[in-house]
């Protein structure tokens, strides 16, 4: 059921925009993991330099850390931004689709005639359900991707 809900968007007329945004989310997430690997290596160099009292390498390592931290922040911010753009586009598409189904072909009128019109605010329910579905689906995907690549990168 969830797969059918997801796949309809990825095969719609917006599929190329959606796939491009998803590729951006994946690339930025992988970039974040790569920056974590670089920071891990930096930690080794930094604390070895401190332990060996190699103070001449202290400031260059601090500069390197600043560069790594800056890049990691850039990756993280853009990953959130691109994910939210994808989320908004997906939510808008799904909400429009289900509102059209609800309001099209006199569906609401037929339910009212049949005496099944006791639902209040169906448009709000559709919007909330779509929001939850898209948010949780993308969150789960990005979380699994980030944790799996971190596991592979650090093991």
Each predicted region: which residue ranges?
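Membrane-integrated ABC transporters
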Residues: 1-36, 44-65, 79, 83, ...
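A generic short-segment signal for beta-strand/edge and adjacent turn/coil regions
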Residues: 14-16, 70-71, 95
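Transmembrane-helix bundle segments that line or gate the permeation/cavity pathway
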Residues: 36-39, 87-88
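Hydrophobic alpha-helical segments in the permease module
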Residues: 65-75
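Inner-leaflet juxtamembrane helices
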Residues: 79-95
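Short cytosolic helices in intracellular loops of multi-pass membrane proteins
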Residues: 91-108
């Amino acid at each position: 059921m969830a797969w059918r809900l997801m796949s309809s968007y990825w095969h719609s007329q917006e599929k190329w925009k959606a796939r491009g945004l998803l590729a951006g989310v994946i690339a930025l997430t992988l970039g974040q993991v790569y920056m974590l690997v670089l920071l891990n290596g930096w930690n080794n160099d930094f604390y070895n330099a401190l332990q060996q009292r190699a103070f001449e390498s202290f400031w260059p390592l601090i500069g390197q850390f600043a560069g790594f931290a800056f890049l990691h922040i850039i990756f993280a911010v853009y990953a959130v931004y691109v994910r939210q753009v994808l989320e908004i586009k997906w939510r808008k598409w799904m909400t429009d689709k289900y509102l059209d189904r609800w309001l099209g072909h006199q569906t609401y009128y037929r339910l009212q005639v049949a005496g099944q019109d006791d639902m209040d605010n169906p448009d709000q329910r559709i919007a909330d359900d779509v929001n939850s579905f898209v948010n949780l689906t993308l969150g789960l995907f990005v979380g699994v991707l980030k944790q799996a690549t971190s596991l592979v990168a650090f093991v």
